[in-house]
Amino acid sequence: RPQLGSKLREVESRGIEMMLVVDVSNSMLAEDFQPNRLERTKYAIDKLFDGLKQDRVGLVVFAGDAVVQLPITSDYRMAKAFARRISPSMVSVQGTDIGQALSLATMSFSEKGDNPAGRVIVLITDGEGHDSGAIEAAERAAEQGIRIFTIGIGTPEGAPIQIGGEFIKDDKGEMVVSKLGEPLLEKIAQATDGAYIRSTNQSIGLDEIVRTINNMEKGDLAALRFEEFNEQFQYLIGAALVLLLLEFLLLDRRNP
């Protein structure tokens, strides 16, 4: 039915805030997960949003640098659209600076209110980066009551990295094999009362995190404004009838 005009209404909700922090370095293109680590991650994130209720989500992507791809929002449709566009080209500097990514995510939550929502960071990476301040960043997050759940994607055996049909090689001309690095991810989770989960081709591990989040204490989220359309069906019908009546009267005058 036709809808015209709009109105705004405020909706109070209770839930948690979650920042997804996704590794988009070239090593995430390794194919020990199908079709590769990054594409498998994007698929899992898409499904994650289907399992959330009144929670708010944001997205940080990182490699050697970190970028807020999506600020905290309750619009899951928008979040899905942004997550589907994730690619290594979003970050100009290659590498895996987990510390910078965690620091940026920590600063990207909304401000606390009187009854703040629980805050969670979900870090998805193959863990190949150096420490580079990651533990310190995790400890700072813990001081603010933020829990970090880490998901390791990849296999201990690893896989080569293919870009544009060619495999990446090192300075010696040997093929680079990217392997899952778990110790750092375990330490980050332990520092924040979170948990580390090793992904498999069957399950990235986000389902387990959703179950944990759903059992967390909820807090007040900022009032959300939704734009709604007013039903105008009856007015359009009325206008159409008036136009038809005028046309009938004009024709009647022309044909006495």
Name what the model sees in each region.
Residues R1-E10, N215-P256:
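C-terminal signal-anchor/stop-transfer transmembrane helix together with its immediate cytosolic
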Residues L185-N215:
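Extended, hydrophilic extramembrane loops/domains of integral membrane proteins
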Residues S92-T96, M107, K112, A117-V120, ...:
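VWA/integrin I-like adhesion module and closely mimicked acidic/polar interface patches used
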Residues L29-E31, V68-L70, G129-A134, G158-I161, ...:
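Extracytoplasmic/secreted cell-surface and envelope-processing proteins
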Residues R1-R119:
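Membrane-embedded segments
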Residues V22, V60-A63, I124-G127, I151-G154, ...:
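Active-site-proximal beta-strand/loop segments in catalytic clefts of secreted hydrolases
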Residues D75-M78, E166-K169, N214-E217:
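Short, hinge-like loop/turn segments at secondary-structure boundaries
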